[in-house]
A protein has these predicted regions:
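TPR-adjacent "capping" and linker segments in tetratricopeptide-repeat scaffold/adaptor proteins
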Residues: 4-20, 89-100, 105-108, 220-231, ...
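Structural detector for internal amphipathic alpha-helices that build alpha-solenoid repeat scaffolds
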Residues: 23-30, 40-43, 56-60, 85-96, ...
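Short coil/linker segments at helix-helix boundaries
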Residues: 55, 60, 65-70, 227-229, ...
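Alpha-solenoid HEAT/Armadillo-like helical repeat scaffolds in large eukaryotic proteins
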Residues: 104-112, 134-142, 153, 164-172, ...
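Short hydrophobic/Thr-rich beta-strand motif most characteristic of the beta2 strand and flanking loop
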Residues: 482-490
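A short, hydrophobic beta-strand element within the central beta-sheet of small alpha/beta folds
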Residues: 528-538
Length: 736
């Protein structure tokens, strides 16, 4: 709510219909008729008032009625009112940042009287970073006696101007540089350190270098003055991790500033919050390389930054696909896709950086606990890594010694990660690299891949309860069922975590968190997500009376595992698929493909130990079982497969409802096993002989090959030759 007249924009000419509806809505708020007020506000919103008009209406409204509504109105009325007020706030922000208004204020600042000057300083502060381009231009064009006024204005604005001012230090004018360095030294914000260090160590006038050093010391105190590339790298890492020192204020726009060397002016690029911190990290890495193109220490962070950007974009696009981000406009979605294309194109060439930097990036991701980035690094190393990277065991069997260090040590360490996806992808990468030599971690690779093949779903659950013991208990019990658990210990955290990406598959909530429960049951993002309420003897009756038929189940505290299991069954009874299942299938596929690609003749890995796990995965969708059957073909060529495995393959081949690709893959695997075993079982022969009459020519051909490899009798082949006319239309007797 605007209270200071000096901050009020000029009033926008109003649309009579919108004005009438808005005034009626506010009157209804004042009368506490909240449902009727909500309907009126919805009509106002349906007429698409622009931001400036909404701002004028807001400023003319009865403020107390709006305040009371936020305290007393039902959630649906509050939500509708918030939508209107967010449009009005956009109008206020647009007005504060209007360049024509800023130009008038800068003029008042530089040539106005004392009162106008201080009024301009105050109002320019509300414009924040948006005022910097004009203030810098004015510094370039005016005489030194006005510079102090501009510097005073910038210092009063403070932290919001640090990023554009740091970029503006690239200006050629040394007088302007002096002023900007002085301002940054007075503000004392660590985000300016890299740019100041670049001046101090760069090819600048001695007076500029001296001013830069003085500003640096004001910021760091007695700390060590570091080189510019190191400063840029440290700042990039701070943005990558979203450390407190680099967080934007809630009211600030997310802008990436650049200096145009040709025009000697600032340029800006507005970005969404999800992109800002990672793109800033990327920019700062390149700033370091601009100063020293041999400074390869930035490469691991740059790799992590790109992988994290792609992961973040994919999460948002996934939510768009599920219809869970209604607040995104078509332009927002187009921006997401454009960013994905850009990052994908860049990542297609990052392999040129060399595998040593991907190992370092993996180390960085593991240290940060960033599973998504670690998995991406492991996937890249699956293509780049080689046997020479492994920590090979040397010496004879009695006195074996391990190489002190090896490039692939981060992958070996990842086999012990608490995160399944990190373990599974590390095993896949090591399987691709393994040769005949034993190496540290070898004994974990195949068992880990077998675990990955056994994944059948990794749903995401929210556990929200004020009792930490309940949270810890459910974390363990749900984790054993392959749930990914996000926890919240109070109602506010429950709401924040409940709507954080990725969206949850089930919400397990303390019955006392009524506000959160009601929100989960009504919000479009969560109303289709099953809710399980944790009740006590004291509130069970009231809770069931209120929420019976609205939630999936009630579970009494203290929670018994059997009760929770029954509740989960009830919660998911009508849900056919989840994003968690997709994650599990990805794990299955990665493991099967890794086993399919192992050179069985040149590996120390006990690949035969994976045969049973591969056989069990034949019930999975084609994307997985095709790779599993390739793996069985690969392994079966060199190791005998059990009868049960062959029976499983026969079931796939003999079922005409399966895809042709799956049936062919199973026959190929059976053929490889038959060649290895110098024959096959009667059950396999029986299936193969039946398939000689299959309607698919490719299936008939593969079945014939299996029979030939089985050293079978010539009977089936003669039958095949005797039915030479079964391809195409039946031949009619007497036909020409």
């Amino acid at each position: 709510v605007v209270t200071d007249a000096s901050e009020r924009p000029r009033e926008e000419k109003q649309d009579p219909e919108i004005t009438k509806l808005f005034n009626t809505a506010v009157d209804l708020l004042g009368q506490k008729k909240y449902d009727e007020a909500r309907v009126m506000f919805e009509k106002v919103l349906s007429l698409n008032p622009n931001a400036s008009m909404a701002l004028t209406l807001r400023n003319q409204a009865k403020q107390q009625a709006i305040i009371d509504a936020f305290m007393e109105a039902p959630d649906d009325t509050r939500d509708t009112l918030k939508k209107f007020l967010s449009i009005a706030e956009r109008g206020r922000r647009d007005w504060l940042r209007d360049q024509k208004r800023i130009a008038e204020l800068v003029e008042n600042l530089t040539i106005g009287n004392f009162d106008k000057m201080w009024a301009a300083i105050y109002e320019l502060r509300t414009a924040g970073q948006h005022a910097v381009p004009q203030l810098v231009e004015t510094l370039k064009k005016t005489k030194p006696d006005t510079h102090s006024k501009i510097s005073m204005s910038l210092m009063h604005t403070g932290q919001p101007v640090v990023l554009p001012l740091s970029e503006a230090l690239k200006v050629k004018d040394s007088v302007v540089k002096h002023e900007l360095v002085f301002v940054l030294g007075q503000i004392k914000d660590s985000r300016a350190l890299p740019a100041l260090a670049a001046l101090y160590t760069g090819n600048e006038l001695p007076s500029v270098k001296e001013s830069a050093l003085e500003a640096i010391k004001r910021i760091i105190g007695d700390g060590q003055v570091k080189s510019a590339p190191v400063c840029y790298l440290e700042e990039a890492y701070a943005y990558y991790q979203k450390k407190f020192d680099v967080l934007q204020a809630p009211h600030e726009d997310f802008i990436i500033w650049n200096w145009d060397a040709e025009t000697q002016s600032l340029t800006q690029r507005n970005v969404p919050e999800y992109a800002f911190y990672l793109e800033m990290a990327e920019k700062l890495c390149y700033e370091a390389l601009t100063i020293d193109d041999s400074f390869q220490s930035v490469y691991p962070l740059l790799i992590c930054t790109y992988f994290q950007q792609l992961h973040t974009i994919d999460l948002h696009l996934d939510e768009v696909e599920k219809g869970q981000t209604a607040d995104l406009t078509p332009e927002d979605i187009a921006g997401l896709k454009a960013r994905k294309d850009r990052i994908t194109n860049i990542l297609s060439t990052t392999s040129a950086l060399g595998k040593q930097h991907f190992y370092a990036a993996l180390n960085l991701a593991l240290a940060d606990g960033n599973a998504a980035v670690a998995v991406s690094c492991e996937s890249a190393l699956r293509q780049l890594g080689s046997m020479g990277d492994l920590p090979v065991i040397v010496g004879d069997k009695k006195d074996r010694k391990i190489a002190v260090a090896a490039a692939a040590d981060p992958l070996v360490a990842a086999l012990d990660s608490d995160n399944k996806q990190i373990r599974y992808n590390a095993a896949a990468a090591l399987a691709a690299m393994a040769g005949r030599s034993a190496f540290r971690g070898l004994d974990k690779v195949i068992p880990t891949l077998c675990d990955a093949l056994g994944e059948r779903g990794a749903r995401v659950a929210l556990v929200a309860d004020s009792d930490i013991q309940v949270i810890n208990q459910l974390k363990v019990e749900l984790g054993e069922q392959s749930f990914i658990v996000d926890a919240a210990a109070d109602e506010s955290a429950a709401l924040n975590t409940g709507y954080a990406v990725p969206m949850k598959d089930v919400l397990i909530v303390d019955a006392g968190f009524k506000k959160a429960i009601d929100r989960f049951l009504t919000d479009y993002r969560s109303r289709k997500v099953p809710v399980i309420l944790l009740v006590t003897d004291a509130n069970a009756k009231e809770t069931k009376a209120t929420y019976d038929g609205k939630v999936a189940a009630f579970v009494a505290k203290p929670v018994q595992p059997a009760d929770m299991q029954a509740a989960l069954v009830e919660a998911f009874k009508d849900i056919k698929d989840t994003s968690g299942k997709a994650v599990a299938l990805g794990m299955n596929y990665t493991a099967a493909k890794a086993l399919a690609n192992i050179d069985v003749t040149a590996t120390a890995l006990p690949v035969q130990d994976a045969i049973d796990a591969l056989a069990k995965s034949l019930a999975l969708p084609d994307e997985v079982r095709l790779e599993s059957m390739k793996a069985l073909t690969n392994i079966g060529t060199h190791f005998a497969a059990a009868q049960a495995v062959q029976n499983d393959l026969c079931m796939v081949a003999g079922n005409g409802a399966n895809s042709t690709s799956a049936r062919l893959a199973s026959l190929e695997a059976l053929t490889a096993i038959a060649i290895k075993n110098s024959g096959t079982t009667d059950a396999v022969k029986e299936v193969a002989e039946k398939l000689l009459l299959d309607k698919e020519a490719e299936i008939r051909k593969a079945a014939a090959l299996l029979i030939g490899a089985s050293a079978s009798s010539t009977g089936p082949v003669m039958r095949l030759l005797g039915n030479a006319n079964w391809v195409g239309e039946p031949v009619k007797v007497g036909a020409p």
